[in-house]
């Protein structure tokens, strides 16, 4: 069997998780051919997992120039995602990027333009697109059977993190290291799913609290209101300070309501779409007939393994990706807009003013408090990325 020779850049939480999946033979068409990390302890760990003969590099460019790999998986701090992706494109390597696509959209736009010029496969690690509930939810919305979207609401507060999480790396939860908090670290999956299913809004009014629940400088509590081109509205609420948290994604449409919660999808279907019912009904307190359904799904949620297997299939046979790399800019547009709205203290419109966003971000980077004397900790992330 032909295999994709993968080089992993960054052997931290996510990089080591991918290695674990590949070692367990969950990705039969992928082999780890080399790894790169600036931390010698992580290279030693990789050798212990993959064998003493594993080619290890302390320089990602050297690994990319080695001729040992066909593709790279970029799993490093956020600011460097576009940089290494573009280095890969220049060398004709296929590229898979961990979320988020980057920190600011102007940077990611450059990455996308470079990808368009390269004849390679470019994917994003949006593993939650493999979730059976969200796939089914999107299929129903996109089919048009329930009509136009009227309202969206996502309460996603089960991203709880204790202070120890933020203390596990000097770059964590800093403007200079991560470029943001819960929106850029935990919620890229949710923001991607929100726009993947409902589309991008045209107006964003966000209220962010910075270091509300933790000793950090970035946001850990968010409440956002959005408006869509068709007049629909939406809310997005998230936090890393709630325990227990909630995860309820609700979409109201002309013909009913979809609710994703607890790994299940429910549908409240109207016998007559609301606009038509309101027009023809003559009873002052009349209501359309409503039926409630538990929506069946295929039950499959292949997560990171599914994304990597699709990546290999795209390289070897031209099969579709779970998420094309160019799509990473969409969810990032939402988080950038939320940050900018909060910083300016007013709503912002899309398309985003990328220059203004970058200027405001750099103000915060210049005064960022880089943590010192921090002992980096690599944690087991398995079980933390399921239905969200």
Describe each model-derived feature in a short phrase.
Residues 1-51:
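N-terminal Rossmann-like dinucleotide-binding module
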Residues 10, 128-216, 345:
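Predominantly a Rossmann-like dinucleotide-binding segment in NAD(P)-dependent oxidoreductases
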Residues 53-60:
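Conserved SAM-binding strand-loop segment of SAM-dependent methyltransferases
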Residues 71, 77-129, 144:
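Beta-strand-loop-alpha-helix segment that lines the small-molecule cofactor/substrate pocket
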Residues 75-76, 237, 253:
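Short, well-ordered coil/turn residues at beta-beta hairpins
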Residues 188, 213, 237-245:
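Glycine-rich phosphate/pyrophosphate-binding beta-alpha loops
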Residues 223, 250, 254-326, 348, ...:
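C-terminal glycine/acidic-rich active-site capping loop/insertion
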